[in-house]
């Protein structure tokens, strides 16, 4: 009888505040990759070298391949992959960037690849203390919220997206094992000005 009552138990609520705080701490220094790396390390994230066939490694490799196809002159700036358990959630932070003619862009992404649902808009609004723009992500059941400026002044954009578990992504993303919640902070510097 105990097993049956355990099966009926409500799932634990998603630890949104803790995960959002981890994202803010990890990604607040994204203007400079070394600063972002120091921030994640100081916050207790572990530098991580995933197996090549792991979901996070495939996501990163696919992103780099897509950028190189879009512009063969792009220089990929690698800031590393980091891992941390936050309130029982396994999170990955990916710090990266690209350098193109006249533009340097840095990005910090925190992935919760097993998140079962999107964060409620009200919770995101309360946390960010401002309204996001809601943008379609073209994925049934998915969501995408964007803030401009981003996580803090000086950041270009902040985005929080959700992809339902088991989703097959459309081209050109087909084959990328992306699911769950992705928290993104980005900065852009125009070097030709």
Question: At which residue positions do the language-model features occur?
Answer:
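Short glycine-rich, low-complexity/disordered patches
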Residues: 28-56, 134-151
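Accessory recognition modules or surfaces
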Residues: 4-20, 37, 51-93
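Hydrophobic transmembrane alpha-helix bundles
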Residues: 36, 69-78, 174-187
């Amino acid at each position: 009888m105990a097993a049956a009552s355990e099966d009926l138990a409500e799932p634990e609520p998603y630890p949104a505040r803790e995960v959002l705080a981890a994202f803010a701490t990890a990604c607040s220094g994204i203007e400079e990759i070394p600063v972002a790396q120091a921030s994640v390390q100081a916050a207790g994230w572990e530098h991580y070298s995933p197996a090549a066939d792991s979901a996070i490694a495939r996501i990163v490799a696919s992103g780099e391949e897509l950028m190189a196809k879009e512009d063969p002159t792009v220089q990929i700036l690698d800031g590393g992959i980091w891992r941390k358990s936050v309130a029982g959630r396994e999170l990955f932070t990916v710090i990266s960037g690209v350098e193109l003619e006249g533009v340097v862009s840095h990005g910090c992404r925190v992935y919760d690849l097993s998140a079962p649902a999107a964060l409620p808009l009200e919770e995101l609004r309360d946390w960010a203390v401002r309204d996001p723009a809601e943008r379609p992500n073209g994925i049934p059941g998915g969501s995408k919220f964007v803030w401009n400026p981003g996580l803090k002044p000086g950041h270009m954009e902040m985005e929080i997206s959700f992809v339902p578990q088991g989703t097959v992504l459309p081209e050109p993303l087909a084959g990328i094992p992306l699911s769950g919640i992705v928290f993104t902070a980005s900065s852009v510097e125009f070097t030709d000005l």
